[in-house]
Amino acid sequence: MKRLLFLTLILIPTLLMGCSEQEVYLFSYFKGNGEDGLHLAKSEDGRNWTSLKGDTSFLKPELSRDKLMRDPCIIIGGDGLFHMVWTVSWTEKGIGYASSKDLITWSEQKFIPVMAHEEGVRNCWAPEITYDKKSGTYMIYWATTIDGRFTETVEPKESNLSHRMYATTTKDFKTFSPTFLLYDHGFSVIDSTIIPDGDRFVMFLKDETRSPVAQKNIRVSYAEKLEGPYSAPSEPITGKYWAEGPTVLREADGS
């Protein structure tokens, strides 16, 4: 669940950069267990990165008993605001949300109890947001294990976890649709990220299978609608090593 999120080409304000405005890629990330909150880095080419504000936190976590800000995911919404979600704890039934006009001053942090309706929920990990311009809808999605569900893929070596991707939609971050199962293709899955690509949506995901044959790789699925259904996964796009936390960068030339 270690991941660095939010790569997009944006115009960063003078206050954030400490210099004149500049169009760059921005990288959101956390350090350690996420105790000190949101960190940001910039890049002009998507390959060489410089941390901002001396690699100190832009926002301290306030939610849950653990007060963590892991896996921060930020997008620019249709309203021009920066919208961020994050993992607030290893074991909570919800996620964190905040918004900002400039990445410096943030709204009040809000706990969204996305899995509070379910018994046996173990976690809500690595939430992300994708915006559908056509419908004006935001979809928030994350990985959860529910005790007693998908027992055929429970992994004894990993605390009997068996994750699937769940989601909710909203247009205003005030009211949310009922949580629904977003992705289940018969294996444990975490760390999904979805981008629009023309008339389709592309999901990059981690196959979390450890036994009998370890996968731990990144695969790709496709859907005509943001809410799915998503196709069966591709073959791994990563090599013979364990990978997780994919982030997608669309370069300035659109590739």
Regions found by a protein language model. Give the residues of each.
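Carbohydrate-active catalytic/glycan-binding domains of CAZyme proteins
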Residues: 18-255
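Sec-dependent N-terminal signal peptides
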Residues: 4-16
